[in-house]
A protein has these predicted regions:
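Secretory targeting signals
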Residues: 2-14, 34, 38, 42-88, ...
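A short amphipathic helical element positioned immediately N-terminal to and/or at the very start
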Residues: 17-29
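Transmembrane helix boundary and interhelical loop/hinge segments in multi-pass membrane proteins
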Residues: 86-108, 112-113, 120
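Short cytosolic juxtamembrane segments of multi-pass membrane proteins
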Residues: 265-269
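Transmembrane helix segments
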Residues: 189-224
C-alpha cells in the first residue's frame, strides 16, 4: 500500500527571518564588547547628566535658568554615548569580517540580505530599548540633583519634554544603524568607525568656516545637526523643526543601509 505523505507547511520568509534573528540575538548577547560598549554609553549618559545637575545651578543666574533648554542640557551625555552606539553598530557586522566568522554565517544563511536584515532588526531593537532607558535615566538624574524650585526643573508632562527624551533614544538607535550601514559598506572596523566619526563631526567643523549665510543654509542639514533637533524643546533659529530634522538624519542612515544591502550581494565574503 502506498502511503502519501501529507504536504509540509510552507516555510515562510517571516519565519525564516525570525529564526535568523534569534541566531543574531544570540551572537550579540555572547560578545563581551556588546555589554561593555552599552555599559559605557549608559554610564557616560547618566553620569554626565548627574554632574551637570550638581554644577549648573551654582554657575547660572536665575535669569539664565529660566531661558536655558534644560531638557537638552540633561541629555548632554548624548555626545559621548552616541560614539558608543555608533561603534557598536559598526562592530555588529565588521567584527565577523575581521575574524572570518562571516563565512560560517553565510554558509548557514546563504541569503545575504536576509542575514543583514536580521542583524539590523536585532541591533535596532536592542539599541532602542537601551537608548530610551539610558536617556530617561539621564533626564531623571539631572532633575534629581537640581535644587527645589530651580528654574531648570521640568516634568515629563511639560510640552516637548517626553518627545525630546524618547527622541534621544531614537537618535542613538538611528546613529547606530548608520554605523551598521557603513560597516556593511566598508567591512573594516577601523575604517567604518573613522568614517562614521568623520561624518558626524567634520562637516560641522567645515561649515563653521563658511560665511554666515552659507552656514544658515547648509548646517541644518548636516547629520548631527539634523538629528539632534529631536532632543530640543525650544526651537532655535536656523535649525529644522524636530521631526523634519530627525527625518533628514534618518535619510543618512537609510542611504548607508541601502548601499550595504546592495553591496553585500555583489562582493565575496
Amino acid at each position: 500500500m502506498t502511503v502519501i505523505a501529507a504536504p509540509r507547511a510552507p516555510y515562510s520568509a517571516i519565519a525564516h527571518l525570525a529564526d535568523v534573528s534569534r541566531s543574531e540575538l544570540w551572537k550579540l548577547r555572547t560578545v563581551r564588547s556588546t555589554y561593555w560598549t552599552l555599559l559605557a554609553a549608559v554610564v557616560s549618559n547618566v553620569a554626565l547628566a548627574a554632574l551637570l545637575g550638581i554644577l549648573l545651578p551654582s554657575n547660572l543666574s536665575a535669569r539664565q535658568d529660566a531661558t536655558i533648554d534644560s531638557t537638552r542640557v540633561s541629555l548632554g551625555g548624548l555626545h559621548l554615548s552616541q560614539v558608543a552606539f555608533g561603534v557598536l553598530g559598526v562592530l555588529v557586522i565588521t567584527s565577523e569580517y575581521g575574524t572570518g566568522m562571516i563565512r560560517a554565517t553565510l554558509a548557514a544563511v546563504p541569503q545575504r540580505r536576509l542575514m543583514l536584515a536580521a542583524k539590523t532588526i536585532v541591533f535596532a531593537v536592542t539599541a532602542l530599548i537601551v537608548g530610551i532607558a539610558s536617556c530617561l535615566a539621564a533626564y531623571l538624574a539631572f532633575q534629581a540633583f537640581l535644587p527645589a524650585g530651580d528654574g531648570m526643573r521640568t516634568s515629563l508632562s511639560d510640552p516637548g519634554v517626553l518627545r525630546a527624551v524618547t527622541g534621544a533614544g531614537l537618535y542613538l538607535t538611528v546613529l547606530g544603524l548608520l554605523g551598521l550601514g557603513l560597516g556593511a559598506i566598508i567591512r573594516s572596523s577601523a575604517g567604518a568607525i573613522a568614517t562614521l566619526l568623520g561624518l558626524l563631526f567634520v562637516p560641522s567643523l567645515l561649515a563653521a568656516l563658511l560665511p554666515q549665510s552659507w552656514q544658515d543654509t547648509i548646517a541644518p542639514y548636516l547629520p548631527m545637526n539634523a538629528g539632534e533637533t529631536i532632543i530640543t524643546v525650544h526651537h532655535q533659529a536656523h535649525t529644522l523643526q524636530p521631526w523634519p530634522g530627525f527625518g533628514v538624519f534618518c535619510l543618512y542612515a537609510a542611504a548607508a543601509l541601502t548601499a550595504g544591502f546592495i553591496l553585500i550581494t555583489r562582493r565575496d565574503a
